[in-house]
Structures are given as structure tokens and as C-alpha cells.
Amino acid sequence: MSLIKVTNLTFAHDGSYDNIFENVSFQIDTDWKLGFTGRNGRGKTTFLNLLLGKYEYSGTISATVSFEYFPFHVEHKENHTIDVVADIDPDFEHWQLLRELSLLHVSEDVLYRPFESLSNGEQTKVMLAALFLKENRFLLIDEPTNHLDLHARKLVSDYLNQKSGFILVSHDRAFLDNCVDHVLSINKTNIEIQKGNFSDWWENKERQDNFEMAENDKLRKDIKRLSEASKRTSGWSHEVEKTKNGTRNSGSKVDKGYIGHKAAKMMKRSKSIEKRQQSAIEERSQLLKNVESSESLKISQISYHKQQLVEFDRVSIQYGEREVCRDVSFSVEQGDRIVLSGSNGSGKSSLLKLICGEEIPYSGTLRIGSQLKISYVSQDTSHLRGNLSDFARNCGIDESLFKANLSKLDFSRVQFEKDIASFSGGQKKKVLIAKSLSERVHLHVWDEPLNFVDVISRMQIEELLLEHSPTILFVEHDSEFCKQIATKIVELKD
């Protein structure tokens, strides 16, 4: 066991006016299984890069271990997988590699295939196995679940549960719950560490947020009451002082000593009220700093004139010699929230693209309603560039609704002035989701919409879909999201 000590860390990207981290201090035990959470753009990947020494910063980061980053860059993907592993760890023991691959349910034959021929899931598992071969290393695992199907996520999560000594960036709640014992969270104003899994951290956060909101409401009422009391006391004191100075025309004799004593007493009480009021204001100013905004999202909806929107009848898709799915039959009706489930390569994305009009060779019958309007969220975000106003204009969507939803998804004002190409992966996916919510359509078709999207934003999207019940056909491997949202599951077999 050793410690990674972060002391007074301050960092900002070149050209930025705002610090991502400011005087941050905390300690990490190198035996921990540390989940790393925070909203998109808060600096999770930046912090990992600081540990790797990629950026200059002020403050200190001290550690007696070396850091390894996942996913690592593979320069020659055409090489055999075993050679890729050797590039990462030239001294690896073959039997140890086979042991790690066995834990991940990966067969030995993948080692003798070109790395580029492996599926995304196989590549992820091989890279993790290679990194855990190294001793005295603390692993920085950055979003390993992207593009992994449910089965692969469970395997990788179980594998990490047997390991220790890593930071894991993931937005999959079930995945984190199964394999972390501490949570490092980047909040609005600080970074904190708590013991437990993600659900433990979230429960504590909700409890703290609710307490602070109740305390804030109580202090707001106290401040108002004290303000009114201060005005009354000040008024009484002023009236008493006028009496002392003989300004009243009652004709009675004034006892200036008694009146002066009473005025002083009133003044003392007024100062006491002011002091209590100021104390309440200061106490209130310390609250709600890390309460995350999770305002309700809005959606632009229209109804279709028929109950059934789409029907697949024994649809099969084949690319050359490779058949990706066979005899798929199901229908999409108004109000359905259907998830396509199946392993990677089972044809889920191909079926979505087929609905959206992409020319994909298929057999069987596909019936799409006449004049059906569809909004599509693709996995790919590489085409996104330009500013948000131009993007909204080019897409023909309501710019105010589009930007309002992005703001609710934690986009700051400065974000609206940036080029979309500079956004983080999660922020780019939010752009596509906000666009889809702004389109007046009958059917939403979403292909892995939540890749890179932070947990709180996922919860906001869940609340929207449950409240407004738009018709949606989607592919997603976040088991918690699917459990909350799907009204039907269409299982695709290999």
C-alpha cells in the first residue's frame, strides 16, 4: 500500500480564463478500486493526463507508483495481438497473460490474430489484461464500457472486481457498483472522496443535497424574519430618540435618562438582530455550492395518425458472406420504448439505419408508415463542428429549445461560444440528443446515445422519457437505463 498525494493542485488549459482545478488537495490509496465521476467537461480525463505528466500545473502530485492509461494507443493494429501485448510489456510471462485472458473469457487464439480484426470488446479485454500484467502500476482506466454489450460489460466488471489499484472513469451505474470500493467525484466547487460504491455515493449526495436545500429554505425565512424585525426595532429606536429630544408636542415632561436608556436598549437589540441576520446570510452562502442542477428537459412531440409506425417481418441483413441478423420480426407502435438487445455484431445498428433510409441490403419485409418523421442519433460524433447557433439553423430546429436543453444538461455560457469540435465526447453526444429532442418527429431512433454521457444527465434523460413517453427505438448497453426506460425488449440472436 502507498499513497498518491495531490496538494494544492491548480490547472487551466492554455488560453482559458477559468481554472479546471484550483487549490485541490486529496489522497488516494493505491490499493483502492476507485470510481471517478463528475459531469461532462469537469476535467476527469484532464486529471488522468495530469497524473501521466502530460500538462504543466501548479501544486504537487507525489506517488511511488507508475501510471498506465487505458485505452493505450496501438500504433500497428495490423500486428498480431501477442505482439501488441509485447510492445506494452516486453517482459510479460505467457502463462500470466493466458490466466488474465481466461478470467475475461477470451480464448488464446485471439493472440495470433491481427489486433485490428478483434471486436471492440475483445480489444478492450486484451488491453486490460496486458496492463494488469505489470507490477507496481496504478491503472487509469478511462471509460472502458463504451461500445461494450451488456454481456461484455458484466465480464469486464467482474474482472475489475477481482483487481485493485485503479481509477475507473465510467458513467454506467451498475458497472461501477460491481467493481469499485471508493468514489472520487468532481463537484461544482471541489473534489471529494467517499468510501463505498456508486450507489452509496449517490445516496449520500442526495441526502446532503436535500439537507442543504431544506437548510437553505429555513435560513431564507430566518433572514426575511430578522430583516423585518430589524426594521421594526430601528423604527422604535428612532421614535424613542425623538421623544428624548422633546420633539413630541404632548406637553408632558420628558425623563431623558429613562428615554436614553430605553433607546440604547433598542439600539443594542437592533445590532443583535443585524448580527444574527448577517450570520444567517453567511451560513446560507456556504450551502448549495455542489447541488447539481437537474432541471426537467423539454421535448418537441407530434402524434402519428396511425397506431403502428414501423413493422419488421422476417427481415434478414447480410453483408457479403456475413449474415448479421436473420428473420427479425417486431412492430413499433405509438408510445413504445423498445430496446434492441444483443451482442456486438448482431445487427442492432444495421436495423436502426435501415429504418432511417440507409441503403442496406436486406430480405424480408419492412413497412414504414407514410410520411413518418424520424429523428436519428448515431454513435458517430466525428462530423460535428462549428458553433451551436449555426448547427441549430442548419438542422432546422428551434434554437431556443435546443440551447435550453443543453443548458439543463450542464452546458455553461462559455460553451455556447465554442466550436463543437472542441467539446468532450459526452458533450458532443448531448448536442445530438438535444437536437433530437428539438425535432418535431413521430419516432426517435437512438443508437447508443449515452456513450460518454455523465450519470446525472442520464437520469435527466430517463425522467424526460418516462414523463413524456415519446415513441423511441434504441440501442443502449447501460442496464440501469434500459431497466428504467424500455417497455419492450427485442432480443437479437447471433
Name what the model sees in each region.
Residues 283-310:
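Coiled-coil termination/hinge junctions
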Residues 1-216, 300-494:
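ABC ATP-binding cassette signature C-motif
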